[in-house]
Amino acid sequence: MSGVRAVRISIESACEKQVHEVGLDGTETYLPPLSMSQNLARLAQRIDFSQGSGSEEEEAAGTEGDAQEWPGAGSSADQDDEEGVVKFQPSLWPWDSVRNNLRSALTEMCVLYDVLSIVRDKKFMTLDPVSQDALPPKQNPQTLQLISKKKSLAGAAQILLKGAERLTKSVTENQENKLQRDFNSELLRLRQHWKLRKVGDKILGDLSYRSAGSLFPHHGTFEVIKNTDLDLDKKIPEDYCPLDVQIPSDLEGSAYIKVSIQKQAPDIGDLGTVNLFKRPLPKSKPGSPHWQTKLEAAQNVLLCKEIFAQLSREAVQIKSQVPHIVVKNQIISQPFPSLQLSISLCHSSNDKKSQKFATEKQCPEDHLYVLEHNLHLLIREFHKQTLSSIMMPHPASAPFGHKRMRLSGPQAFDKNEINSLQSSEGLLEKIIKQAKHIFLRSRAAATIDSLASRIEDPQIQAHWSNINDVYESSVKVLITSQGYEQICKSIQLQLNIGVEQIRVVHRDGRVITLSYQEQELQDFLLSQMSQHQVHAVQQLAKVMGWQVLSFSNHVGLGPIESIGNASAITVASPSGDYAISVRNGPESGSKIMVQFPRNQCKDLPKSDVLQDNKWSHLRGPFKEVQWNKMEGRNFVYKMELLMSALSPCLL
């Protein structure tokens, strides 16, 4: 065997890929080979960082492993130690050097962290500075130069600090002087709008209307104070004003006079507890100071209190059939039966309690702003009358006295006329009359609108005048038929709505007076709409050449109408062969009868008296037309079709 030549054999793995699965038929499924990144990750997972990294332990472990793995290697190792020859020891782990470097870096970081903790906390160790050698007694010229520069810089800094302190004081004084000038300028603006006077060391103003003729006893005095709630160190706010006003506590907040009309009277227990809803304060005009808005609101509160006091005084003094009721902040009057007029003083202050009460008592809007505005106009007129009645300064040699007394001499006024001039209506009486007119006008408008929406034929139109009086309004009512406005315009009514009655003026000048009852106006308009149908037939007959035989607005025959009277008209065809009779009532409606010639009436019995043929041309009895089966959009259109069917065809 020794003489046989050696053969070189290449040994390689039997399978380059690992077998994943072997099927029942012997088919093997291989795993794909790992990529370089996957192989790197697999090798990194084999590193055990928990074991020690000492070289002695590794060498000991390697020696023991080799001794256990190769029993015959002990003697050779001893021989190597004795000889002192260092042999290469392979590592047990992949990337062993990487692991060792990472562990050493971690150890250094831990040591650095501990040192920093000791330096910062100083609980366990204190670091003393390293002592330096003392400088020689002889100083360098550079050191002397540095010391001189430091002294000069310190002197310059002291000068700058003193200058900055002086500048700060001057700025503060300028701000104080500016605030003082602003206070004087604001006080000048305040004097341009309000009456001011100086009493002692205080500046007082007047909110009342005494100079305009008011007799309200409230003093209405406010005080002008200087606003000192400003920190000069902070930035001045944009809305800052150096002047402020202090008004009486009873004039704070907002107030208004609420006037409402109620159809049903509330219980007697509800009187004086009117639901208040807070009206927002008026927004200040851009550029106006805040004290202007504050004083205007306070003056408005004072005026509202004066109006309510005047109304309460008149309500107690006036003797009426239904006495007026004054309870707390509410005045209740009864202008019409089952109708109430409520006048309330609503005053809400700026405190939280009143705001909470206002939010809880918030109610729907039923306030009549027109009457509130009229109350303000009436109180100003009352002020003007009071101011004009005051005797002005006059010469002693020619006294002219009161205006009414002056007029009584030249114009020879007697006592009754002078008394009539002196007697005038009060504020409450005027506002009650205006409330009556507003309620009557709204009721008339509602009645006309309900009829216009309920009745389509004929149509009713209302044209309200935009120029009205506080005690009288006018509306023009037109009753027309759709498509026939040019020929059917005979019903034109002018309604003059007053305080307690409505005057109706017809087109021909007739005048009818209606009361405040809603039913009277409704019945009158229904009767006029009924008469319009008959007038439309009359105008249509003239256009189509038919002859009007009879016409009456008030028919005495037939069923009696509960609303007004029925009207009727009879027209004949141009040839005289046919006749149409129309009767229209407000409740019974329309009834149309047609009269045919006798020769066309087959159901007439033969008469032994009338033997001549000329009597056959006379018209026979009337036959009623089934009006609801006629085609047409309205009454006049149906009547036009009926007349066209009965008229001869002219070719």
From Swiss-Prot:
One of its GO terms (molecular function) is nuclear thyroid hormone receptor binding. Ubiquitous. Residues 51-83 are annotated as: Disordered. It is found in: Nucleus. GO terms for biological process: positive regulation of DNA-templated transcription; positive regulation of transcription by RNA polymerase II; positive regulation of transcription elongation by RNA polymerase II; positive regulation of transcription initiation by RNA polymerase II; protein ubiquitination; regulation of transcription by RNA polymerase II; RNA polymerase II preinitiation complex assembly; somatic stem cell population maintenance. GO terms for cellular component: core mediator complex; mediator complex; membrane; nucleoplasm; nucleus; transcription regulator complex; ubiquitin ligase complex. Keywords: Activator, Disease variant, Nucleus, Transcription, Transcription regulation. InterPro entries: Mediator_Med17 (IPR019313). It comes from the Eukaryota. The keyword Acyltransferase does not apply. It holds the Pfam family Med17. It is linked to Microcephaly, postnatal progressive, with seizures and brain atrophy: A disorder characterized by postnatal progressive microcephaly and severe developmental retardation associated with cerebral and cerebellar atrophy. Infants manifest swallowing difficulties leading to failure to thrive, jitteriness, poor visual fixation, truncal arching, seizures. There is no acquisition of developmental milestones and patients suffer from marked spasticity and profound retardation. Progressive microcephaly becomes evident few months after birth. Component of the Mediator complex, a coactivator involved in the regulated transcription of nearly all RNA polymerase II-dependent genes. Mediator functions as a bridge to convey information from gene-specific regulatory proteins to the basal RNA polymerase II transcription machinery. Mediator is recruited to promoters by direct interactions with regulatory proteins and serves as a scaffold for the assembly of a functional preinitiation complex with RNA polymerase II and the general transcription factors. Belongs to the Mediator complex subunit 17 family. PANTHER family: MEDIATOR OF RNA POLYMERASE II TRANSCRIPTION SUBUNIT 17. Interacts with GATA1 and PPARG. Component of the Mediator complex, which is composed of MED1, MED4, MED6, MED7, MED8, MED9, MED10, MED11, MED12, MED13, MED13L, MED14, MED15, MED16, MED17, MED18, MED19, MED20, MED21, MED22, MED23, MED24, MED25, MED26, MED27, MED29, MED30, MED31, CCNC, CDK8 and CDC2L6/CDK11. The MED12, MED13, CCNC and CDK8 subunits form a distinct module termed the CDK8 module. Mediator containing the CDK8 module is less active than Mediator lacking this module in supporting transcriptional activation. This is Mediator of RNA polymerase II transcription subunit 17. It comes from Homo sapiens (Human).
